[in-house]
């Protein structure tokens, strides 16, 4: 790359329009500049390619993460957390490990600790829709519905097609007895994902609370068919 820079400087000085305004020099100068930029970008790309996967994700961190995932599959959440921690010792900014650790803690109903994991993710990546959604779920489990709604708002602003966030938002509104808003959320969730059985069931619950029994029955029937 050093030789390319030197050659570029020589040619640029030779054909620069300010130095020699002869016909065609401006065009040649532009061609030289364009060629240099192309070579420079190609060199940068080559440098990026030479970075090994193991430089970004050390082998021991990946191994610990994979062991944690295997334990999650067996529902051994306590042991899985130990291995997620090992992965995070080596890679403190490993977003997915923080999310999966938070999920394991949530399954153990350790919601406050899970919240800490999702906060870590949001420090690393404030636009993580999964972290906003899961943080909202934890807050909802802790009956902090207003705070949970703020999280679901963020998730759906970042991704309006996040049907799970719309569903959980509906659950919060239902618990706050804001039935019309809850119904709107479940409607959005089922429009985005028509085979979302949970949202159909939840929509039925809202309609039943609103004394719309026939409509509620249709939703329950829809949910039942989808679960078969």
Q: Language-model segments: which ranges?
A:
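J-domain helical core
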Residues: 1-15, 24-47
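Alpha-helical segment of the N-proximal tetratricopeptide repeat
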Residues: 56-96, 100-109
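Helix-start (N-cap) detector for alpha-helical repeat units in TPR-like alpha-solenoids
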Residues: 61, 95-96, 129-130, 163-164, ...
